[in-house]
Amino acid sequence: MGRFNVDMIERVIVAPCLQSPKNILHLSPIDNKTRGLTNILSVYNASQRVSVSADPAKTIREALSKVLVYYPPFAGRLRNTENGDLEVECTGEGAVFVEAMADNDLSVLQDFNEYDPSFQQLVFNLREDVNIEDLHLLTVQVTRFTCGGFVVGTRFHHSVSDGKGIGQLLKGMGEMARGEFKPSLEPIWNREMVKPEDIMYLQFDHFDFIHPPLNLEKSIQASMVISFERINYIKRCMMEECKEFFSAFEVVVALIWLARTKSFRIPPNEYVKIIFPIDMRNSFDSPLPKGYYGNAIGNACAMDNVKDLLNGSLLYALMLIKKSKFALNENFKSRILTKPSTLDANMKHENVVGCGDWRNLGFYEADFGWGNAVNVSPMQQQREHELAMQNYFLFLRSAKNMIDGIKILMFMPASMVKPFKIEMEVTINKYVAKICNSKL
């Protein structure tokens, strides 16, 4: 039994409020590489900025109809080309909109710290086993809760947009919900700016070698928050050691890599790697224009021998991560092709870790009149062994009722959550204690 139940009130197809040209749009090579559906849950509290009688479902439904005028691909359908690529047919049919009502208040969500089956009700999931031509590219569900707050569940096809692009759409939809005539940032398609050869230098091939074992322990969703105060302690220690600046993202990625390698007791003679996406919009010879909402990511990858990684310091891991980001950008700009090594091809599934960062994609800034989202979370389909969510860490902003820091949403075997958190605390406390002692 879940924490709450949701009743669907209405499901409709929302078309753009103005007709747009019916045409065919080609996708970029990166778009074709990033196929699949992604779900986002955005939580909004009741607000004194709007009247009690204000209806978020009605407001967002109308805003969706308006914003689709500027994002016509999301009102269309995908179709296969003769060579196996995808392209968008701008039909003007529309996106799916669902209005729903939950029988409890927002507190039952518990900040999405752990997975609960009832969360599945917050995103309307059309069947995925349909022909690609029949698949809706955007679904928006507004679920009101008894406290007056609500959740917006967004589902989009990743081939049409990356995370930053869908964040741009949601922000634009919020602006139109608040009375603006058009989005403040003009959406730009221009997929021809990404050339077929570009994909060769963005390191997507790292994912080609990830093969899970047959007997894979079920992953669960768990979380922890690292305060910015503690992150800044670590950054200060690193600055004292090497006069090098590291971002909060780099610090947390390094902590995760070390803690996970230790807690999973990976043999010292094996290799481990950590992969994370990098926005490449400004790395092209002609930087992609602001408003470009297609996929524009590359994959940085740091790899090392377990013995060397664990015998080294946090600074050592940080330098590997920073070098991997630099190498991705330099190789892309200089057109230096790096082919996967035999170590890549033979690496065990459990030795590969993925990290992602949703904090600054625009999801939190989508304001439909009730203020910014107070919490954001992914919503994966209920599959026990989905490869993409094994050994994965996602960075989110901590919810308003938490300490100010980075929330780490983790997907790993249940038996490993506690050992991992212990290793994280041990490493963090080492540097916090160092700073505290220096103040004495």
Swiss-Prot record:
The active site is at residues 158, 367. GO terms for molecular function: 2-alpha-hydroxytaxane 2-O-benzoyltransferase activity. Belongs to the plant acyltransferase family. It catalyses: 10-deacetyl-2-debenzoylbaccatin III + benzoyl-CoA = 10-deacetylbaccatin III + CoA. One of its GO terms (biological process) is paclitaxel biosynthetic process. This is 2-alpha-hydroxytaxane 2-O-benzoyltransferase. It comes from Taxus cuspidata. Pfam families: Transferase. Transmembrane segments: none annotated. It is an enzyme of class 2 (transferase).
